[in-house]
């Protein structure tokens, strides 16, 4: 979820992007830590990539919808036995995905500029068009 994501500016980090950041990281400790890792430790890894391809979702909201769809399909496949109690409810999915909202939105905004190919997806995961680096 963070591969290739550019670090954000201090101004971008100042404001929480969702309820989880607002309520559980009001001082920005976690988001600043993650940002520092992106700026420092991850850069050497990112530099090893010689070719970048992105499957670009239409939005973070759509990523959330896809995650719910995935969980619902898993629940339908496994049934309702207690052995499968790890299946998340919609509220649990909403909380879970908030951990990745900042990185996802940042990647949707900045990652296409560094990719060799960007495959734009619609809500049904169909490729609508392909961007090739100039």
What are these regions (language model features)?
Residues 2-134:
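Conserved NTP phosphate-binding and transfer environment spanning the P-loop NTPase/kinase superfamily
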């Amino acid at each position: 979820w963070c591969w290739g994501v550019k670090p954000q500016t201090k101004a971008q980090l100042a404001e929480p992007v969702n309820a989880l950041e607002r309520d559980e990281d009001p001082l920005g400790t976690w988001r600043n830590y993650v940002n520092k890792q992106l700026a420092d430790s991850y850069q050497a890894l990112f530099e090893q990539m010689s070719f970048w391809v992105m499957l670009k979702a239409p939005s973070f909201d759509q990523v959330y919808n896809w995650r719910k769809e995935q969980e619902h399909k898993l629940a339908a496949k496994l049934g309702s036995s207690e052995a499968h109690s790890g299946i998340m409810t919609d509220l649990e999915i909403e909380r879970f995905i908030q951990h990745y909202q900042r990185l996802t939105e940042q990647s949707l905004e900045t990652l296409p500029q560094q990719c060799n190919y960007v495959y734009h997806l619609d809500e049904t995961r169909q490729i609508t068009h392909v961007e090739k680096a100039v």
